[in-house]
Amino acid sequence: MKAPDVRCDVLVIGGGAAGIAAAIAAGRAGARTVLLERYGFLGGLASAAWVGTICGLYLRDTAGAEAVPVSGGFAQEFAARLQKMSGAKPMRVESGLWVLPYQPVNFAQVADAMAGEEKNVTVVLHATVAEAQAQNGRLQRVRALAWNEPLAISPAAVVDCTGEATAAALAGAPAEDGGTDQATALVFVLENVDPALAQRGLLEVRRELRRAVENKILPPICERLSLIPGSAVQGRMAFKLSLFPATPGRPLWEQVTNWERESRALLEPLRKFLAENVPACREARLHSVAPQLGVRSGRRVLGRARLADADVLGVKKSPQGIARGAWPMERWTSSPRPEMTYFAERDYYDIPLDCLRAKELDNVFVAGRCLSAETGAMTSARVIGTALATGWAAGTAAAFQAAGKAMEAAIKETRKDLGRTECKL
């Protein structure tokens, strides 16, 4: 079957938080934009893995009574739309960190609505990239399957928001494997849970789970259970079961397949134990399970610059800064709780545009988990709020390059957007 040849100014691959922002930014800049997404809905892991909270939108503040946005611009516009649809409000969780809770279906609905409002953006769902061809230092063509029909796209510029730098790597861009850096997680929802459990926290649950593990009633992984903040609605609560990091040297596809199957198999024994030993869960039933695991790390492109751990911890500012990071380093390892490394309160670090530009492919930009960063820095910059910001910056830069404009102009435009406080509702 001959693939139709589609020409566009900007091709965005991956419709998660970064990809949505990149496509809308490029479209608003006047670029004919195509957005490819492998699922039948937008939102990426925010929709498919049921992350449940948007981190990175607000400054850390242990004393303040209200959440303070780290910047204006598209990230806050998206958050405002999500709040308007769901009624969600920012909440402080611990150590002065603020998050915006959300329902996964609302995230996908807002993404659909906002992308659909852009006349220059064409969304292609159920689309999987199969090949990326580069020549003379530029990505020239991408071949994909869209609902099992071949599609060939010739873009002027590309934004890789796949979370795994898939297109950039297929085209030969140098990258580093971050797939073993952090543990994955499975989110599931229990119904008929006493709402008081959300107020009391999980101390009682964790005590019982520790006993179950010590007595070999449940496997050790069950101690890694946590409650998703703000998820308690009408007797339903979303829980996160953090798995273990990948084993270096073994194929990731093999490990991910095993994690998906084995973690789901744990849910009924876990639910049964909670029902028998935790009064608040006595009538609990398994309501639903996220369609896929939440993956916290993946392959990262080597960019023209690299966000360093020291840049994050030292809240370094840059005249080339096009996004702001406000979330601490959050490393999920084999420990039951994450290792948090904080920087100064009420402050942020800049992410320079060159961290979003592939080193050896002139027309390839990256955003979200694909950006060029050291391992520790990525544990901060990977969160949804920051991904919305880096996606917007990458989409703007790609549109400017496709139009023959200088990157300095793209930086200026993006920095102006960071100061934008009004939101299109």
What feature does the model see in each segment?
Residues 19:
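N-terminal Rossmann-fold NAD(P) dinucleotide-binding loop
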